[in-house]
């Protein structure tokens, strides 16, 4: 198990596998950060029910863009240009959760509640990771991501409490996004995640992180008076 800390100036001397895995993980993370605003900003921002909601949507999108910039800067410092993801269509995104569009507030709220929560899990993998420049940018990013999750959770609760029709719409959104959230963790039998762990770039296997997410989010869904969706039906990666 690799336990050293790697600074930018030392990266060229690292094993090619380490550099390849680092390149992959920052590229996917950059795509995830930009993917969210591409999904919802066009339709959700102008349809916000209140000025406060509109402000919070705008701030969320702005912070996600800044997260992309921070990740892109880390990548650029070691010669990797991730700017190509800026011009990708949604259907070209690395992860299924960022393909398509979001044009209802039920979907937007549940996206924040679930998908941004997975984003927090993804970022937590890098806490104390072997590549120091990546660790260094995490505190503010994770703090803001927690805010996005909190807003999504509060809006989900608000919409679920508005009446039967609204609760049914929230449940339908939950059914759509829950399996996408679980799939974001990747395959349980992945061999690549073992290499990430070996090189100190991640702390948990895909299966471990997914189970921790389930243990956290399922009770929250129940507290909202909603039904926990089937964790298998519709999944792409088990």
Name each region found by the language model:
Residues 130-186:
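A contiguous pocket-lining binding segment that forms or flanks enzyme active sites
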Residues 14-18, 36-59, 119-134:
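Helix-loop segments that flank and shape redox-cofactor active sites
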Residues 18-29, 48-66, 108, 132-146, ...:
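Alpha-helical scaffold segments that form or flank carboxylate-/histidine-based iron centers
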Residues 80-150:
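Active-site-proximal alpha-helical scaffolds that flank and shape metal-associated catalytic sites
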Residues 54-55, 59-87, 155-159:
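Conserved alpha-helical segments that form or flank metal/cofactor-binding pockets of metalloenzymes
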Residues 7-29, 88-112, 129, 162-163, ...:
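Acidic/His metal-coordination segments adjacent to aromatic residues that form catalytic metal sites
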Residues 29-37, 60-75, 109-119, 141-152, ...:
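Alpha-helical transition-metal enzyme core signature, strongest for iron centers
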Residues 167-238:
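Extended, helix-rich structural scaffolds rather than catalytic motifs
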């Amino acid at each position: 198990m690799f336990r050293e800390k790697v600074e930018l100036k030392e990266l060229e001397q690292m094993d090619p596998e380490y550099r390849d895995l680092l390149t992959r993980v920052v590229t996917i993370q950059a795509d995830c950060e930009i993917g969210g605003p591409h999904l919802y900003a066009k339709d959700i921002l102008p349809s916000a029910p209140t000025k406060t909601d509109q402000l919070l949507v705008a701030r969320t999108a702005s912070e996600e863009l800044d997260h992309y910039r921070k990740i892109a800067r880390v990548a650029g410092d070691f010669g990797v240009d991730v700017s190509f993801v800026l011009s990708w269509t949604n259907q070209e995104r690395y992860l299924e959760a960022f393909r398509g569009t979001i044009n209802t507030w039920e979907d937007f709220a549940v996206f924040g509640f679930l998908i941004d929560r997975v984003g927090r899990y993804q970022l937590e993998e890098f806490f104390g990771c072997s590549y120091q420049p990546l660790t260094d940018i995490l505190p503010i990013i994770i703090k803001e991501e927690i805010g996005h999750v909190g807003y999504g959770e509060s809006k989900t609760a608000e919409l679920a409490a508005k009446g039967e029709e609204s609760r049914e719409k929230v449940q339908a959104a939950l059914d759509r996004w829950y399996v996408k959230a679980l799939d974001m963790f990747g395959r349980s039998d992945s061999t690549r995640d073992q290499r990430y762990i070996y090189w100190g770039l991640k702390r948990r296997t895909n299966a471990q992180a997914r189970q921790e997410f389930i243990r956290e989010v399922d009770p929250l869904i129940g507290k909202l008076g909603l039904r926990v969706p089937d964790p298998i039906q519709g999944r792409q990666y088990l």
